[in-house]
Curated annotation (Swiss-Prot):
The gene is rlmE. Keywords: Cytoplasm, Methyltransferase, rRNA processing, S-adenosyl-L-methionine, Transferase. One of its GO terms (molecular function) is rRNA (uridine-2'-O-)-methyltransferase activity. It catalyses: uridine(2552) in 23S rRNA + S-adenosyl-L-methionine = 2'-O-methyluridine(2552) in 23S rRNA + S-adenosyl-L-homocysteine + H(+). This is Ribosomal RNA large subunit methyltransferase E. SUPFAM superfamilies: S-adenosyl-L-methionine-dependent methyltransferases. The keyword Glycosyltransferase does not apply. Specifically methylates the uridine in position 2552 of 23S rRNA at the 2'-O position of the ribose in the fully assembled 50S ribosomal subunit. It is found in: Cytoplasm.
Length: 216
Protein backbone atom coordinates (compact mmCIF):
# COMPACT_ATOMS: atom_id res chain seq x y z
CA UNK A 1 0.00 0.00 0.00
CA UNK A 2 2.79 2.42 0.94
CA UNK A 3 4.54 1.75 -2.33
CA UNK A 4 1.37 2.41 -4.32
CA UNK A 5 0.87 5.68 -2.45
CA UNK A 6 4.46 6.71 -3.11
CA UNK A 7 4.08 5.89 -6.81
CA UNK A 8 0.84 7.84 -6.97
CA UNK A 9 2.46 10.87 -5.31
CA UNK A 10 5.41 10.73 -7.74
CA UNK A 11 3.11 10.56 -10.75
CA UNK A 12 1.00 13.43 -9.45
CA UNK A 13 4.09 15.58 -8.84
CA UNK A 14 5.46 14.66 -12.27
CA UNK A 15 2.36 15.60 -14.22
CA UNK A 16 1.72 18.71 -12.10
CA UNK A 17 5.31 19.85 -12.75
CA UNK A 18 5.29 23.03 -14.84
CA UNK A 19 8.46 22.00 -16.67
CA UNK A 20 6.91 18.68 -17.68
CA UNK A 21 3.95 20.61 -19.09
CA UNK A 22 6.28 23.07 -20.84
CA UNK A 23 8.27 20.20 -22.38
CA UNK A 24 5.09 18.66 -23.75
CA UNK A 25 4.01 22.04 -25.14
CA UNK A 26 7.39 22.97 -26.61
CA UNK A 27 8.13 19.55 -28.09
CA UNK A 28 11.05 18.64 -25.86
CA UNK A 29 11.55 15.03 -24.81
CA UNK A 30 12.19 15.80 -21.15
CA UNK A 31 12.04 18.56 -18.56
CA UNK A 32 15.85 18.38 -18.45
CA UNK A 33 15.90 20.52 -21.60
CA UNK A 34 15.11 23.55 -19.48
CA UNK A 35 18.11 22.97 -17.22
CA UNK A 36 20.40 23.30 -20.22
CA UNK A 37 18.39 26.19 -21.66
CA UNK A 38 18.69 28.10 -18.38
CA UNK A 39 22.44 27.53 -18.23
CA UNK A 40 22.71 28.55 -21.88
CA UNK A 41 20.79 31.75 -21.23
CA UNK A 42 23.19 32.69 -18.44
CA UNK A 43 26.51 31.43 -19.79
CA UNK A 44 26.16 31.37 -23.60
CA UNK A 45 27.84 27.98 -23.59
CA UNK A 46 26.70 26.63 -26.96
CA UNK A 47 27.34 28.45 -30.22
CA UNK A 48 26.72 27.77 -33.92
CA UNK A 49 29.20 25.44 -35.59
CA UNK A 50 30.49 23.81 -32.40
CA UNK A 51 31.45 20.15 -32.01
CA UNK A 52 29.79 18.76 -28.88
CA UNK A 53 29.65 15.43 -27.01
CA UNK A 54 26.50 14.75 -24.97
CA UNK A 55 26.86 11.98 -22.35
CA UNK A 56 23.80 10.48 -20.67
CA UNK A 57 21.79 11.82 -23.56
CA UNK A 58 18.58 9.74 -23.47
CA UNK A 59 15.77 10.50 -23.97
CA UNK A 60 17.31 13.39 -25.91
CA UNK A 61 16.30 16.62 -24.19
CA UNK A 62 19.81 18.06 -24.07
CA UNK A 63 20.59 16.80 -27.57
CA UNK A 64 17.50 18.56 -28.94
CA UNK A 65 18.59 21.86 -27.42
CA UNK A 66 22.23 21.46 -28.45
CA UNK A 67 21.43 20.39 -32.01
CA UNK A 68 19.26 23.45 -32.53
CA UNK A 69 21.90 25.81 -31.13
CA UNK A 70 24.91 24.45 -33.06
CA UNK A 71 22.98 24.42 -36.33
CA UNK A 72 23.78 22.67 -39.57
CA UNK A 73 27.50 23.45 -39.47
CA UNK A 74 27.88 21.95 -35.99
CA UNK A 75 28.40 18.36 -34.96
CA UNK A 76 26.86 16.47 -32.05
CA UNK A 77 27.85 13.02 -30.78
CA UNK A 78 25.46 11.66 -28.14
CA UNK A 79 25.70 8.52 -26.02
CA UNK A 80 23.62 6.69 -23.43
CA UNK A 81 23.16 3.19 -22.10
CA UNK A 82 19.45 3.52 -22.96
CA UNK A 83 17.87 3.74 -26.38
CA UNK A 84 17.22 7.18 -27.83
CA UNK A 85 14.98 8.01 -30.76
CA UNK A 86 16.98 9.53 -33.56
CA UNK A 87 17.49 13.28 -33.90
CA UNK A 88 18.49 14.68 -37.30
CA UNK A 89 22.25 15.16 -37.72
CA UNK A 90 23.03 13.65 -34.30
CA UNK A 91 25.38 10.66 -34.10
CA UNK A 92 24.08 8.39 -31.33
CA UNK A 93 26.14 5.65 -29.68
CA UNK A 94 24.21 3.31 -27.39
CA UNK A 95 26.06 1.45 -24.67
CA UNK A 96 27.55 1.50 -21.20
CA UNK A 97 29.99 4.41 -20.97
CA UNK A 98 31.98 2.59 -18.28
CA UNK A 99 33.00 -0.01 -20.88
CA UNK A 100 36.12 0.56 -22.97
CA UNK A 101 34.31 -0.49 -26.15
CA UNK A 102 31.86 2.41 -25.88
CA UNK A 103 34.62 4.89 -25.12
CA UNK A 104 36.44 3.69 -28.23
CA UNK A 105 33.29 4.12 -30.34
CA UNK A 106 32.95 7.70 -29.12
CA UNK A 107 36.62 8.43 -29.80
CA UNK A 108 36.30 6.88 -33.26
CA UNK A 109 33.27 9.07 -33.98
CA UNK A 110 35.24 12.14 -32.88
CA UNK A 111 38.18 11.19 -35.08
CA UNK A 112 40.75 13.96 -35.46
CA UNK A 113 38.24 16.67 -34.64
CA UNK A 114 38.88 18.80 -31.58
CA UNK A 115 35.77 19.03 -29.44
CA UNK A 116 34.53 22.42 -28.24
CA UNK A 117 32.25 21.22 -25.45
CA UNK A 118 31.51 18.07 -23.46
CA UNK A 119 28.19 18.00 -21.58
CA UNK A 120 27.09 15.24 -19.23
CA UNK A 121 23.75 14.66 -17.53
CA UNK A 122 24.76 11.12 -16.53
CA UNK A 123 23.64 9.66 -13.21
CA UNK A 124 23.61 6.09 -11.90
CA UNK A 125 20.45 4.28 -10.93
CA UNK A 126 19.95 5.59 -7.41
CA UNK A 127 19.41 3.15 -4.54
CA UNK A 128 18.76 5.83 -1.93
CA UNK A 129 21.88 4.76 -0.03
CA UNK A 130 24.50 7.51 -0.16
CA UNK A 131 27.32 5.06 0.57
CA UNK A 132 26.38 3.22 -2.63
CA UNK A 133 25.14 6.05 -4.84
CA UNK A 134 27.95 8.59 -4.36
CA UNK A 135 30.82 6.30 -5.46
CA UNK A 136 28.81 5.32 -8.54
CA UNK A 137 28.01 8.94 -9.36
CA UNK A 138 31.59 10.09 -8.84
CA UNK A 139 32.93 7.27 -11.00
CA UNK A 140 30.77 8.47 -13.89
CA UNK A 141 31.96 12.03 -13.27
CA UNK A 142 35.59 10.90 -13.33
CA UNK A 143 35.09 9.01 -16.59
CA UNK A 144 33.39 12.03 -18.18
CA UNK A 145 36.33 14.22 -17.15
CA UNK A 146 38.75 11.65 -18.55
CA UNK A 147 36.96 11.81 -21.91
CA UNK A 148 36.93 15.61 -21.82
CA UNK A 149 40.68 15.59 -21.20
CA UNK A 150 41.21 13.41 -24.26
CA UNK A 151 39.08 15.32 -26.76
CA UNK A 152 38.66 18.97 -25.74
CA UNK A 153 40.48 21.65 -27.66
CA UNK A 154 42.50 24.19 -25.67
CA UNK A 155 39.96 26.67 -24.33
CA UNK A 156 37.13 24.13 -24.55
CA UNK A 157 34.35 23.81 -21.98
CA UNK A 158 32.86 21.08 -19.79
CA UNK A 159 29.40 20.94 -18.16
CA UNK A 160 28.53 18.03 -15.88
CA UNK A 161 25.87 17.00 -13.40
CA UNK A 162 27.37 16.39 -9.96
CA UNK A 163 26.07 15.46 -6.53
CA UNK A 164 27.34 16.93 -3.27
CA UNK A 165 28.85 14.23 -1.09
CA UNK A 166 31.94 12.14 -0.53
CA UNK A 167 34.47 12.58 -3.30
CA UNK A 168 33.05 15.81 -4.69
CA UNK A 169 35.57 18.19 -3.09
CA UNK A 170 38.52 16.27 -4.52
CA UNK A 171 36.85 16.15 -7.94
CA UNK A 172 36.20 19.89 -7.80
CA UNK A 173 39.86 20.56 -7.02
CA UNK A 174 40.98 18.33 -9.89
CA UNK A 175 38.81 20.23 -12.35
CA UNK A 176 40.08 23.59 -11.12
CA UNK A 177 43.60 22.47 -12.10
CA UNK A 178 42.48 21.77 -15.66
CA UNK A 179 40.25 24.76 -16.44
CA UNK A 180 40.57 28.53 -16.13
CA UNK A 181 37.17 29.08 -14.54
CA UNK A 182 34.92 26.71 -12.58
CA UNK A 183 31.41 27.62 -11.38
CA UNK A 184 28.40 25.82 -9.94
CA UNK A 185 24.91 26.11 -11.40
CA UNK A 186 21.57 25.03 -9.90
CA UNK A 187 18.90 25.70 -12.53
CA UNK A 188 15.45 26.61 -11.26
CA UNK A 189 14.12 23.65 -13.25
CA UNK A 190 16.17 21.30 -11.04
CA UNK A 191 13.88 20.03 -8.31
CA UNK A 192 14.55 21.60 -4.91
CA UNK A 193 14.85 18.27 -3.14
CA UNK A 194 17.42 17.01 -5.64
CA UNK A 195 21.08 17.11 -4.58
CA UNK A 196 22.12 17.54 -8.19
CA UNK A 197 24.04 20.59 -9.30
CA UNK A 198 25.87 21.38 -12.50
CA UNK A 199 29.56 22.11 -12.58
CA UNK A 200 30.58 24.40 -15.42
CA UNK A 201 34.28 24.46 -16.29
CA UNK A 202 35.51 26.86 -18.95
CA UNK A 203 38.84 27.36 -20.66
CA UNK A 204 40.46 23.93 -20.82
CA UNK A 205 44.19 24.20 -20.12
CA UNK A 206 45.14 20.66 -21.12
CA UNK A 207 46.21 17.63 -19.13
CA UNK A 208 49.96 18.26 -19.63
CA UNK A 209 50.73 14.57 -19.51
CA UNK A 210 48.67 13.85 -16.39
CA UNK A 211 47.68 10.21 -16.12
CA UNK A 212 44.26 9.30 -17.43
CA UNK A 213 41.75 7.70 -15.10
CA UNK A 214 42.00 3.93 -15.12
CA UNK A 215 38.87 2.38 -16.59
CA UNK A 216 37.67 -1.02 -15.41
Amino acid sequence: MARSKTSHNWLKEHFDDKYVKMAQKDGYRSRASYKLLEIQEKDKLIRPGMTVIDLGAAPGGWSQVTSRLIGGQGRLIASDILEMDSIPDVTFIQGDFTEDAILEQILEAVGNTQVDLVISDMAPNMSGLSAVDMPRAMFLCELALDLAGRVLRPGGDFLIKVFQGEGFDVYHKDIRKLFDKVQMRKPSSSRDRSREQYLLARGFRGIDGAASIERF
